[in-house]
Amino acid sequence: MGRGRYPARLKVTVPPPEIAARYYRSWPAHELYHHPDRFPLLNAESLFGRNAPLTLELGCATGEYICTLATAQPDACFVGVDIVAKPLYRAVERAVELGLENIIFLQADARLLYQRIPDCVLTTIILHFPPPLLRNRQRNQLLVSAQMLGCAERSLVPGGYLSFLTDHPDLFSLMQELLPAFPRLRGLPASPSELAVFESHYHRRWAARGREIRGLRIERIAEE
């Protein structure tokens, strides 16, 4: 999720039970860590009851970006993940306003979710503007990690890809340093059209402050 106090300032209410049952899931970290088998697999069949292309956004915040994708691709399925509940409540409101039937929001620690994602089930992973967390004591909380890339290499279908955007040069460099350890992933510079396809809140925010937006399209290479 993007940096700053934006989520803390949100004025939102907890979704009513019937709306939450449709759009919202909470997977507590303690239980997910100690009893992962109590949670469903993160695939379209388990979460939506059908086989369909599945996109996962890590750190989706208020769901602006992933709801736009879900609106444009009604036959696909989408899961937005964030560790904080309040922005997800706004994401649920957005999905209801748009009448979406192909999206679920999941409050969970993304690092604990990877074990619940089967092989070759994701067409796209979205990781846009993750927090840098560059203090030494926070390094293990980074979403840009070997653990995340290992999950991407395993869970993306051949030809699928991870979309990565950041305004932070150190995070971009870290991603480039980690990639060579994953031979089935290939990092390509994001094209101008990919960078401009839709600008989320954080994209607009950091671009307006004059920060350079860097991006990679990290493709899952088909095995020969």
From Swiss-Prot:
Binding site for substrate: 167
InterPro entries: SAM-dependent_MTases_sf (IPR029063), tRNA_(Gua-N-7)_MeTrfase_Trmb (IPR003358), tRNA_methyltr_TrmB_bact (IPR055361)
Taxonomic lineage: Bacteria, Bacillati, Chloroflexota, Chloroflexia, Chloroflexales
Domain of life where this protein originates: Bacteria
Pathway as given in its UniProt record: tRNA modification; N(7)-methylguanine-tRNA biosynthesis
SUPFAM superfamilies from the UniProt entry: S-adenosyl-L-methionine-dependent methyltransferases (SSF53335)
A molecular function (GO) term: tRNA (guanine(46)-N7)-methyltransferase activity
Keywords: Methyltransferase, S-adenosyl-L-methionine, Transferase, tRNA processing
GO cellular component terms, A-Z: tRNA methyltransferase complex
Assigned protein family: Belongs to the class I-like SAM-binding methyltransferase superfamily. TrmB family.
UniProt-recorded name of the protein: tRNA (guanine-N(7)-)-methyltransferase
Gene field: trmB
